[in-house]
Amino acid sequence: KMIECARRKGLSLKREAFRESGRKITYYRGVREWFGRINAYGAGRGIDVQHYINSSGIKEILEGTDIAREFKNIYASSFLYDDEGAAYWPAVGVNYTNKTQFIYKINKGVESVSDTKLVNQYLEEEKRPVQFKHMIFIGDGTTDIPCMRLVKSQGGHSIAVYNPAHQGSFE
């Protein structure tokens, strides 16, 4: 439906058009500085801090942001593209259920969004590349709640961010 609607409105569905949209994203105060500060803080304590995006948003838009390079991986919704580079069908659709699976993929070091074998193999917690107790999940929406609960229940930390200027954003 989204693709049909965009075509009717004459909007470009090319990967580069999505990335261009990402270049226009505005951030909460301090987001750009966060990465350098937290990476330096971790390095000073012998910790290799890794950042991931786990979003129900569009991956190609997120890849266009000026902070995309800070992330080891971006788990998000994405499209299939035709020979001219235009989106024609969803490749990955992300909801709160997928997002919890992506947390396990991060936990077990599985980079592929489509892998269902490695993520489901047993691996002792202490052998996992990113243990839950070392995770900090920062979320801003209702699809983040299950991930926040998962990370917190496994010994990690969860932080909810919201814009106080938006009516009802805290509820």
Where are the regions a protein language model picked out?
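C-terminal cap/substrate-recognition subdomain and adjoining C-terminal extension
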Residues: 22-52, 56-171
